[in-house]
Design a protein with these regions (language model features):
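Classical eukaryotic N-terminal signal peptides for Sec-dependent ER targeting/secretion
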Residues: 1-24
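Mature extracellular or exoplasmic CAP/SCP-family domains and secreted bioactive peptides
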Residues: 15, 27-329, 333-338, 362-372, ...
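Short, conserved beta-strand segments of beta-strand-rich sandwich/propeller modules, principally
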Residues: 204, 351, 408-412
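Short beta-strands within extracellular/lumenal beta-sheet-rich domains
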Residues: 325-351, 395-398
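Solvent-exposed strand-to-loop "edge" motifs in beta-rich extracellular domains
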Residues: 342-344, 355-361, 416
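Extracellular carbohydrate recognition and processing domains
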Residues: 377-409
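Short beta-strand-plus-loop segments that form exposed binding edges in beta-rich domains
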Residues: 413-422
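Edge beta-strands of jelly-roll/beta-sandwich modules across compartments, strongly enriched
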Residues: 423-430
Length: 447
């Protein structure tokens, strides 16, 4: 590539002893790492996982003391896992056997092999310690959620009890104080497994299982792990929208009678079933939205951009609703991109919202990439303005910036890696431009 140069709670279970639940809440302890050519608990440690976190689940090795007697998720178990998740989600959405408000936008979950690989890699570590979000991140889901449980037992039975494990997750809801029928539910400490199970916009799940000898009084431990995409338990966000079931299903889904046009018979009452290449989620305040680019199929036309050099940026689309623009540069290189569509506000105020990750291409090395927002007047390009966008080496960042222009401008981005620096990357997930001032200018980590 030619580039420019520049200067939980404890409870008794019927199987025998103890069930422990965990979610993504506390950084995991340091484990042994293998290089990109080595074998890990999940197979080959690919370079992209070494980018996300130097302690990524797919780059760890299990302790030598871990000697599984059973592991993996069979086809029949996948059906049980999906049925249990969707049955509980349906109960919440419709208000059947649930003390919570009805959910208007609850998606039906589907199996995902990539998430299952991550979940199995975690289970293979034979450790119930919680792990960080970036430790389980995969390319198509920047934020991956996780739940699971650990059961200690004397039983020789190697069969996984997924119904029991997922049922215990649901029972965490008993700890949530009773609220009115119109009060939105938010994540809270001690019930994160339940709120991830009930997170409306999560629609992919994959799980892993392992049974191994225990160092405790009981002879064996059974470790269950599930990974979710997109992950839930996002601070400040509602678990689901309150309202009659099916009334807020996103584009690309059907629910109830609306599924007849797709010749689909719904399996679960009140759940929005994906009928295409993933749901397309609505954006906030669409009435004031001048420009949207999520680098996905739904916004592909508005995402057209010019890259300098031509191979400095590339786009990747994973589902109808998700994708990103990416630049990976070595020391002394730079690249710019500029959206082709000019933007103008009728009253001179623009709010630009950018969601991104940036950092070293190998986690643990220096974060030296300079990522900037470019605002270029169409008639006076020499008056270009640059705004630094920092952070994001581990977390997905969201920046909102208010601009004041009463003439056409073009929006773009610049990425520069100084000489002597390790390789750096940036992923831009979302660019939204509103015809209004932002509520505030801030930088916010999403996970």
């Amino acid at each position: 590539m030619k580039l420019n140069r520049c200067n939980p709670a404890h409870l008794r279970v019927t199987e025998v002893a103890l069930a422990v639940f965990f979610t993504l809440s506390v950084p995991v302890a340091v484990a042994r790492i293998v290089d990109s050519r080595g074998q890990s608990s999940g197979g080959v440690c690919e370079d992209i996982y070494r980018r996300y976190n130097e302690d990524h689940i797919l780059c760890r090795q299990p302790e030598s003391a871990c000697q599984p007697v059973a592991s993996g998720v069979e086809g029949a178990d996948k059906d049980i896992i999906l049925a249990a998740h969707n049955r509980y989600r349906s109960q919440i959405a419709t208000g059947n056997n649930s003390s919570f408000p009805h959910a208007s936008n609850m998606l039906e979950m589907e199996w995902d092999d990539d998430l299952a690989r991550v979940a199995q890699a975690h289970a293979n570590l034979c450790s119930n310690q919680p792990s960080c979000s970036s430790c389980m991140r995969i390319e198509k889901f920047p934020h991956v959620g996780r739940t699971g449980c650990l059961i200690r037992t004397d039983s020789e039975n190697n069969t996984a009890d997924w119904e029991g494990c997922i049922g215990y997750m649901y029972k965490e809801s008993l700890r949530i104080p009773t609220t009115s029928s119109n009060t939105p539910l938010r994540t809270m400490r001690g019930v994160e497994s339940f709120t991830q199970l009930a997170w409306a916009t999560t629609w992919k799940v994959g799980c892993g299982y392992v049974k191994y000898p225990s160092g405790s009084a009981l002879r064996f431990e059974k470790l269950y792990t599930c990974a979710y995409g997109p992950g839930g338990n996002v601070r400040g966000e509602e678990v689901y929208k309150v309202g009659p079931a099916c009334t807020d299903c996103p584009e690309g889904t059907c629910c109830g009678e609306s599924c007849q046009q797709y010749n689909i018979t719904p399996s679960y009452s009140g759940l929005c079933k994906v009928v295409d290449d993933g749901p397309i989620f609505p954006l906030d305040d669409e009435d004031n939205l001048l420009f949207r680019c999520l680098f996905n199929k739904a916004t592909s036309q508005s995402c057209n951009f010019q890259s300098d050099p031509s191979d400095g940026w590339k786009t990747k689309t994973f589902f109808a609703s998700t994708g990103h623009a990416e630049s990976v540069l070595e020391a002394g290189q730079s690249a710019e991109m500029t959206f082709e569509q000019p933007i103008k506000s009728s009253h001179g105020r623009l709010c630009i919202e950018v969601e991104y990750n940036k950092g070293p291409n190998v986690a643990g090395t220096l974060d030296r990439g300079l990522f900037e927002l470019l605002v270029t007047p169409v008639v006076r390009p020499q008056r270009q303005r640059t705004i630094n966008l920092s952070g994001g080496a581990i977390n997905t960042m969201r920046m909102r910036i208010t601009l004041h222009y009463n003439f056409d401008v073009k929006i773009g981005f610049s990425f520069i890696v100084p000489r002597g620096s390790p390789a750096q990357y940036v992923n831009i997930h979302k660019v939204l431009i509103y015809e209004k001032a932002c509520p505030e200018r801030y930088r916010h980590a999403l996970d």
